[in-house]
From Swiss-Prot:
Source organism: Polynucleobacter necessarius subsp. necessarius (strain STIR1)
GO cellular component, one term: cytosolic large ribosomal subunit
Record-stated family: Belongs to the universal ribosomal protein uL14 family.
SUPFAM superfamilies per UniProt: Ribosomal protein L14 (SSF50193)
Oligomeric and partner information: Part of the 50S ribosomal subunit. Forms a cluster with proteins L3 and L19. In the 70S ribosome, L14 and L19 interact and together make contacts with the 16S rRNA in bridges B5 and B8.
SMART domains assigned: Ribosomal_L14
Biological process according to GO: translation
GO molecular function, one term: large ribosomal subunit rRNA binding
Keyword Ribonucleoprotein included in the entry's annotation: yes
Protein name, per record: Large ribosomal subunit protein uL14
Cystine pairings recorded for this chain: none
Amino acid sequence: MIQTESRLQVADNTGASEVLCIKVLGGSERRYASIGDVIKVSVKSAAPRGRVKKGDIYNAVVVRTAKGVRRPDGSLIKFDGNAAVLLNAKLEPIGTRIFGPVTRELRTEKFMKIVSLAPEVI
């Protein structure tokens, strides 16, 4: 469960390592984001020669949360931390690699590229 001011790790090779959620997209009263939701983020720490710089604003999709996601069969998938993948204005991933597992909940038409790049789909 991600809200404004939540910090997330970055699960791609854009050069960013940590981002700060500045807005949950999807309505003015929307407070929380879960796996598969798009958020607006600010880069808080980045590698010196990466594609992104500290202070840049991007869209991102949440790929892992410590809160987890409930499946229809009753199982709960949780992770050790919160992670996101940076997106451009067309909601396409900026990076060319994804690190760590992602969940099956991302298998929509919008995020099939992320699922195909991920090393493991849980």
